[in-house]
């Protein structure tokens, strides 16, 4: 069941991406010849308003084929008025951006839905105090509940670390609820050097406490939900861009690249963990698709945007030979990355 849900999620994300291209193309009067979910043999086809809507055998992607556009050979053109070819560079760029934009919009919608359903949080209750830590020396105890930090109300555990690290003061004031008493504790955090998820050294202020597992949820109002959704979409996009940058620079190894097997497996597990977990992971995949499609690789939207930006800036098109060979290189690179991802997936399964 989880596997089928994973395929359904991927199909929905691909449909949304291609729908973005479709809507923008039709807005500018471009005829869309084919709208396909999946590749390979077409299992189902229905023609509506001159567009063949298809479901194909291999559900690992999808495509919109516009009149006058051929990703496998960009030199194949049509000069009819309803052709992609005759549109101006800025119109083509908008059509190309519409796909990734649709993915970011889908992630935003999912994060907004999460904000209304209730974001999983932990209550600000101490589960453990590290020996000889600043919290230990201040005599904080297990089951203490942190009410405020520097007179700012604390409702959830995640706010504690942020408040400590954002504080401009050397000494931080904690208001603690213990049994039926309210206590004030002034604590000087210690600074530790740690590695983040990208292997970078960062300084972090800590007082030496860990959370007690007391789950709760944080529900946002309508306007605050929009802000939460925007922030989460932006954070996910930034993280993925930075991950790609670290892979290119060699700071993150190629063995960390995951393929379709990992995506399906993790999505299936997320679906078994509940609706919120599925929404979180689906939003992350959607942002991932949006970011990856913006990379300046000729086989992707970003590559086509690059060609059109060149034409917009210089006033002339890239030569047919340059476009053809760069596109072929892009496909080889893309297929190579997909193969590497699948290899890493299989390697992880075997080990």
Region spans (language model):
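Alpha-helical transmembrane signal-anchor/signal-peptide segments
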Residues: 28-33, 118-136, 141
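Membrane-embedded helix-turn/re-entrant segments that form the catalytic/gating core
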Residues: 26-107, 210-211, 217-220, 225, ...
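PDZ-domain C-terminal substructure recognizer with occasional recognition of PDZ-binding tails
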Residues: 141, 147-148, 162-203
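Functional transmembrane alpha-helices
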Residues: 79-83, 87-90, 194-291, 305-329, ...
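Active-site His/Glu-centered metal-binding helix of metallohydrolases
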Residues: 19-24, 101, 105, 295, ...
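Conserved PDZ fold ligand-binding element
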Residues: 135-157, 233, 326
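Divalent metal-coordination and catalytic microenvironments
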Residues: 17, 55, 99, 293, ...
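Hydrophobic transmembrane alpha-helical segments that form the core helix bundle
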Residues: 85-128, 231, 290, 299-300
């Amino acid at each position: 069941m989880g596997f089928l849900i994973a395929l359904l999620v991927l199909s929905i994300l691909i449909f949304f991406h291609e729908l973005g291209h479709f809507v923008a193309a039709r807005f500018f009067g471009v005829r869309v010849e084919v709208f396909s979910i999946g590749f390979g043999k077409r299992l189902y086809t229905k023609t509506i308003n001159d567009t063949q809507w298809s479901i194909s055998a291999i559900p690992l992607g999808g495509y919109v084929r516009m009149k006058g556009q051929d990703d496998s050979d960009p030199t194949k053109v049509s000069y009819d008025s309803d052709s992609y070819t005759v549109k101006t560079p800025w119109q083509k760029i908008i059509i190309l951006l519409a796909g990734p934009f649709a993915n970011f919009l889908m992630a935003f919608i999912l994060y907004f839905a999460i904000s209304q359903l209730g974001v999983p949080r932990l209550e600000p209750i101490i589960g453990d105090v590290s020996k000889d830590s600043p919290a230990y020396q201040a005599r904080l105890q297990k089951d203490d509940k942190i009410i405020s930090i520097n007179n700012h109300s604390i409702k959830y555990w995640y706010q504690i670390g942020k408040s400590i690290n954002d504080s401009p003061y050397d000494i931080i004031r904690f208001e603690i609820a213990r049994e039926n008493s309210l206590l004030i504790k002034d604590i000087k955090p210690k600074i530790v050097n740690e590695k983040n998820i990208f292997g970078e050294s960062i300084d972090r202020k800590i007082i030496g406490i860990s959370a007690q597992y007391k789950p709760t949820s944080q529900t946002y109002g309508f306007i605050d939900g929009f802000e939460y959704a925007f922030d989460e979409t932006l954070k996910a996009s930034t993280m993925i861009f930075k991950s790609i940058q670290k892979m290119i620079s060699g700071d993150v190894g190629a063995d960390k690249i995951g393929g379709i097997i990992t995506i399906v497996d993790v999505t299936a597990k997320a679906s078994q963990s509940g609706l919120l977990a599925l929404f979180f992971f689906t939003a992350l995949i959607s942002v991932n698709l949006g970011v990856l499609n913006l990379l300046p690789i000729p086989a992707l939207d970003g590559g086509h945007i690059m060609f059109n930006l060149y034409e917009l800036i210089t006033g002339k098109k890239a030569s047919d030979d340059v476009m053809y060979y760069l596109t072929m290189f892009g496909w080889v690179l893309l297929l190579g990355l997909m193969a590497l991802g699948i290899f890493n997936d299989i390697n992880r399964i075997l080990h």
